[in-house]
Design a protein with these regions (language model features):
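Contiguous, glycine/small-aliphatic-enriched amphipathic segments in soluble metabolic enzymes
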Residues: 1-138, 181-205, 209-265, 269-295, ...
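Flexible loop/hinge segments that line or gate small-molecule binding clefts
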Residues: 137-162, 167-170
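Residues in well-ordered beta-strands of folded domains
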Residues: 76, 154-155, 163-166, 297, ...
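Amphipathic alpha-helix from the class-I
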Residues: 167-175, 216, 318
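Active-site glycine-rich loop that binds ribose-phosphate moieties when present
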Residues: 140-149, 171-193
């Protein structure tokens, strides 16, 4: 049986509805999974009309009512948006609240095992906070409603997968957060994630923190005191892990296939190479757009995969948004759901 995925519509004023519709207009999406949207049916219908597609929107209240057939988009209709005051491309508290409610509903469905995984379209953090929901983003919402204490963000495209020792902290503080225990935790998380993608024995590369991985202590001590001891312990436990690899070469090697996953020491060390590979320049809009990047939250009891781009208010409602990242997100979530199901069956035998 194909896995059921709950896809959140994202901020209604952004490109979330459009990229969701585009992804669900692909027949191959229904060949690998059974998607159901948590959102507003009226907004999804607007997106269908905007794109001029021959699709039907099936407004439902539960997963049991979904048809799961190509040509029909099943939407658990939460009716969060007042169409009389709604506008594309603007920060609106009602849209921030709507995006929050869509996420909350998807989490509830996954925690109740009514769906096998979740995929999220982008939200706007300003709108979210104006609505009274004070979170940094999706990841923190998921952590709160799944009661998860240890988690990490993994970015991925077709070639590179990267997890971060730290993310949204000042760079000065990030250096202090490079600790043996956290490096070990990150390798464990990305190793498990790669296995969920069907990689039997993942080869994990761990980046150094300092230039040239400190050149035997010439440019810093974090490698010798924290990173190398973590790698040695992991190797003794049987992990196929290598490092510290100089930060200026690890991602080039990963892109060429040497590593199945990488551990970055801080936010920009991991984000910059991924976005160089995953983002394209759109000449029509004069903007950068995500062609293939996805964001996967590791450590949760449920599956969460997201597009690695924002709401793109500047192009919302124009019918030109690229759905490649959404399509890839659905693919990753499907593979993870199948892996977890097979693992559960194996454990029960």
């Amino acid at each position: 049986m194909k896995p059921i995925l709950a896809i959140t519509m994202g901020d209604p004023a952004g490109i979330g509805p459009e990229i969701t519709v585009r992804a669900l207009n692909r027949k191959e999406t229904y060949e690998k999974c059974r998607p159901v949207v948590t959102g507003d049916a009226a907004i999804m219908s607007q997106a269908v009309q905007l794109l001029g597609l021959n699709l039907q929107v099936n407004a439902i209240q539960s997963v049991k009512e979904a048809k799961f057939v190509y040509g029909t988009i099943d939407v658990i209709d939460l009716k969060c948006v007042d169409l009389l005051t709604f506008k594309f491309g603007e920060v609106q508290p009602q849209c921030g609240n709507a995006a929050f409610q869509y996420i909350k509903k998807a989490i509830e469905l996954a925690m109740a095992d009514e769906v096998d995984g979740t995929v999220t379209a982008p939200l706007n953090k300003e709108a979210l906070n104006l609505a009274g929901h004070h979170y940094d983003g999706h990841t923190e919402i998921y952590a709160t409603f799944t009661n998860t204490k240890k988690y990490a963000m993994m970015l991925a495209d077709e070639n590179i997968r990267v997890i971060h020792v730290s993310t949204h902290v000042p760079l000065r503080k990030a250096c202090d957060l490079v600790k043996k225990a956290r490096v070990i935790e990150c390798v464990e998380l990305i190793d498990d994630a790669c296995r969920q993608f069907g990689i039997e024995k993942p080869h994990i590369g761990v980046a150094g923190l300092n230039p040239h991985s400190s050149e035997n202590g010439m440019f810093g001590y974090e490698e010798a005191q924290e990173i190398i001891p973590a790698i040695e312990e992991l190797q003794q436990r049987g992990f196929n892990v290598e490092g510290p690899v100089p930060p200026d070469s690890i991602f080039a090697k990963a892109k060429c296939g040497k590593f199945d996953g990488c551990v970055a020491m801080y936010h920009d060390q991991g984000h910059i190479p991924l976005k160089v590979c995953a983002f394209n320049w759109n000449k029509e809009t004069g903007k950068m757009e995500s062609a293939s990047g996805v964001n996967i939250t590791l450590g949760l009891p449920i599956i969460r995969v997201s597009v690695d781009h924002g709401t793109a208010f500047d192009v919302a409602g124009r019918g030109i948004a690229n759905d490649s990242a959404m399509t890839l997100s659905i693919d990753y979530a499907t593979r993870m759901a199948i892996y977890r199901r097979n693992k559960l069956k194996a454990n029960c035998q």
